[in-house]
Amino acid sequence: QNLQGAINGEMYEINEMYATFLETAKLQGEKGAQLSFFYALAAEKTHAALFQKTKQTLDSTKKDVPLGPIQICDVCGWTTEGDIPDKCPICGAKRDQFQTFA
């Protein structure tokens, strides 16, 4: 139930909130805001995917979901499980610009 609420929140942010913010920034010619909202939108998509994967695993196994280390890009917020990538696929940040949560 909590995971579904989190997924719903992420989907709202993806489909409504950041999409609207990004379009408004484009219309106003705000390049910095466009980049920030682009990064936020991309990060929210990864968050939604992680929540959906976790919910599917939990629904099918009825057990706690083991997670490896979580890596978060300090520049754009892109999030992934496992090893730190050489560079962020969203913003190109180098691996030393990631935070690890184990």
List where the protein language model places each region.
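Non-heme di-metal
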Residues: 1-102
